[in-house]
A protein has these predicted regions:
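Cytosolic regulatory regions of ion transport systems
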Residues: 1-132
């Protein structure tokens, strides 16, 4: 997203995690908890157009997404959720969910049936919403 000209802020509890962004990343890095409102304010949540939560944990992702959507009225909120049942529930509450479990199982199922890899967007309707 940064390379496409968007202003990007990344929040992580561990400063070492920022190494994964690569040396060319010029966005803002904030060490902190993504469900802490003071940290979110420092990151500019009050004026952001899109909020994406992609930690390793479903609970933290959904909490951060709900804070962004409900408290700060962020228009587009996207959250990575590993549990397909939870993903469906949160989607029903207006949060765009990306469920790797659903995407991967669909890809594997169809590859085993056809011998060809399909495009991931066919397995998670919310993927289409990423073109914001």
């Amino acid at each position: 997203m940064y390379h496409d000209g968007h202003n990007v802020t990344v929040i992580d509890l561990q400063s070492e995690a920022f190494r994964r962004l690569g040396s060319k990343f010029r966005g803002q890095r904030i060490i902190g908890n993504g469900i802490d409102e003071e940290v979110l304010k420092r990151a500019g949540v009050e004026k952001c157009d899109v909020f994406v939560s992609v930690t390793q944990g479903d609970n933290r992702n959904i909490m951060a997404a709900q804070i962004a959507k409900i408290v700060y009225n962020v228009k587009t909120v996207i959250s990575r959720i590993n549990d397909p049942v939870r993903a469906d529930i949160y989607r029903a509450h207006g949060i765009i969910t990306i469920c790797g479990t659903t995407i991967l199982s669909g890809l594997l199922r169809d590859f085993l049936a056809t011998g060809e890899w399909a495009i991931a967007k066919d397995y998670n309707a919310e993927y289409l919403a990423l073109n914001v």
